[in-house]
Structure formats: structure tokens, C-alpha cells
């Protein structure tokens, strides 16, 4: 019976497809885990919506994942984590719920040497102040500098990961953070890990915190602690659910995932 509990999937969700960077990190860190992903591609972006709407949409996704009997959830969306994280945890009770902001903040604090941390994220995540709050909860003396970097999202989706336009945009966004002397930079949007090589070159001597990797690490730690790690599954099942299959979805999705997406199914929520 205990083994059946361990075989249950991890549920990962996002407002769109960026959260597939989290799925990729989970596949690499926990290769025996079954994973269900839900991307709300019909209603993306969440960043421009009200708190009540984001909470409402998030609850619908949580219900969907609970119906699929997941053993843990990963909020692979900075906006949802910032706005609806608390409500989601209230609903799921004792189930482990991980999120990119908590994991990213924790990793940034463990990485910084001079206590100056930069965050690049979308407008909503920056305006929510969620990263600064999570960091200051653990260390109130840390200087946290945030920079909204909304133009990077469409550039990543276009596949311009090494394009000169992207490089110039990154440089522009990094200027104020580097001027403040940060030694650690959190990639606070699920699209940004794809720009890690480029950002690393433009922000040399700055440690990059990839919240997809740190969330996967945290998931592994919590599952082990709860006795939920799947250690007996050489053929994991990966399922991808979306609320719409927009143009180029598979192409962009496979770029994020770093492999082919076989089981994509469309479902409507709400």
C-alpha cells in the first residue's frame, strides 16, 4: 500500500508553458517520478489579472490535480505563488506544496556572500514584492533589488535565446542591478532559465539562481522527508494537460522541456 502512495504523480502547474522548465528540472533530479503538468494556456497571462481572478483560476487547477490523485504539488509560476500560494496551501491541507519563490529565495540566501541579491521577474511578481518578503523573513538585513524584465518572455518564446536583440535587452535590465553591486541574481520567471548562458556572460562574477533547479531540489528533500519518494519506477509516466493548444505550442513546449512532448491533452476548467 505504501508503494502505491509513492507511485502517485507530482502535480506541476503554471499559467502557461514556462513551468515546463520546472518539469525538466524535476525529470533530471527525480527520474523515477511520474509527473502531471497543467498549463492554463487559454487564460495566460495571469500577470495582468486581479488577485481574485488568479485565486479562482488557481483553485480550479488545484481541483483538477487533486482529481488526478497527486502526492505533491509544485507551483511553477511566480505570479500564482505570489498571489495565491497561501490559499492553495489552505486547500491542500497536509499535502506538500512547493513553489518557485520560496525555493528561489532560500537558494539566493544560501548563495550570496555580500548580502546583495537581485531579482529579475515579470511586472506582477516584482509588484507583489514576494521575493523580497521571502528573503527578508529569513534575513532582514539583505539588500534586495528587483527589476521587471517583461520583454524577455516573448523573446524566449520566439526562440531568440542567443539573439543580439535579447543580449541588448538583458544588458539594459541588468544595468541597475549590477550598479547596486549584487553578487547573486534570481531568475524569477520560469522562462528565464533558458537565458541562463546569455545572462551568465553579461553578469559575470554574479551567481545565478535558477528557481526551477532549486524547486526540484526542495521537492526531492520534502518527498524524502515525507517518505513519498518513488524509488522503483524505470518507466515514468509524463502527462501534459493544457486549456488550449495554441499555435507553436509543441515547438515552444519542447524547447522548454528539452525533449519531445508525447501526451498533450486539452481540458476545460471552470
From Swiss-Prot:
UniProt-listed Pfam families: Asp_Glu_race
Active site: 77, 189
Disulfide bridge partners, by residue number: none
UniProt-annotated binding residues for substrate: 14-15, 46-47, 78-79, 190-191
EC number(s) per entry: 5.1.1.3
Molecular function (Gene Ontology), one example: glutamate racemase activity
Superkingdom of origin organism: Bacteria
UniProt key word Isomerase: yes
Reaction catalysis annotation: L-glutamate = D-glutamate
Keywords on record: Cell shape, Cell wall biogenesis/degradation, Isomerase, Peptidoglycan synthesis
Associated pathway: Cell wall biogenesis; peptidoglycan biosynthesis
GO biological process terms, semicolon-separated: cell wall organization; peptidoglycan biosynthetic process; regulation of cell shape
Entry similarity comment: Belongs to the aspartate/glutamate racemases family.
PANTHER family named among the record's database cross-references: GLUTAMATE RACEMASE
Role of this protein: Provides the (R)-glutamate required for cell wall biosynthesis.
HAMAP family found in the cross-reference section: Glu_racemase
Protein name according to UniProt: Glutamate racemase
Organism of derivation: Neisseria meningitidis serogroup C / serotype 2a (strain ATCC 700532 / DSM 15464 / FAM18)
Amino acid at each position: 500500500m505504501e508503494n502505491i502512495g509513492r507511485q502517485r504523480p507530482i502535480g506541476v502547474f503554471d499559467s502557461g508553458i514556462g513551468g515546463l522548465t520546472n518539469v525538466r528540472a524535476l525529470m533530471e533530479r527525480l527520474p523515477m517520478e511520474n509527473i502531471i503538468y497543467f498549463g492554463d494556456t487559454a487564460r495566460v497571462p495571469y500577470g495582468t489579472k486581479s488577485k481574485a481572478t488568479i485565486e479562482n483560476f488557481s483553485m480550479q487547477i488545484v481541483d483538477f490535480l487533486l482529481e488526478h490523485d497527486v502526492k505533491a504539488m509544485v507551483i511553477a509560476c511566480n505570479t500564482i505563488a505570489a498571489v495565491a500560494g497561501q490559499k492553495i496551501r489552505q486547500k491542500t491541507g497536509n499535502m506538500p506544496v512547493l513553489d518557485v519563490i520560496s525555493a528561489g529565495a532560500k537558494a539566493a540566501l544560501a548563495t550570496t556572500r555580500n548580502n546583495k541579491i537581485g531579482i529579475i521577474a515579470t511586472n506582477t511578481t516584482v509588484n507583489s514584492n514576494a521575493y523580497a518578503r521571502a528573503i527578508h523573513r529569513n534575513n532582514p538585513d539583505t539588500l534586495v533589488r528587483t527589476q521587471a524584465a517583461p520583454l524577455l518572455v516573448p523573446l524566449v518564446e520566439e526562440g531568440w535565446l542567443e539573439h543580439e536583440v535579447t543580449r541588448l535587452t538583458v544588458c539594459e535590465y541588468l544595468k541597475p542591478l549590477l550598479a547596486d553591486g549584487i553578487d547573486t541574481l534570481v531568475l524569477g520567471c520560469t522562462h528565464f532559465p533558458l537565458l541562463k548562458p546569455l545572462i551568465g556572460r553579461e553578469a559575470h562574477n554574479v551567481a545565478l539562481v535558477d528557481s526551477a533547479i532549486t524547486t526540484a531540489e526542495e521537492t526531492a528533500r520534502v518527498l524524502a522527508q515525507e517518505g513519498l519518494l518513488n524509488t522503483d519506477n524505470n518507466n515514468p509516466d509524463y502527462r501534459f494537460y493544457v486549456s488550449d493548444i495554441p499555435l507553436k505550442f509543441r515547438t515552444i513546449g519542447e524547447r522548454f522541456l528539452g525533449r519531445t512532448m508525447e501526451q498533450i491533452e486539452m481540458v476545460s476548467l471552470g
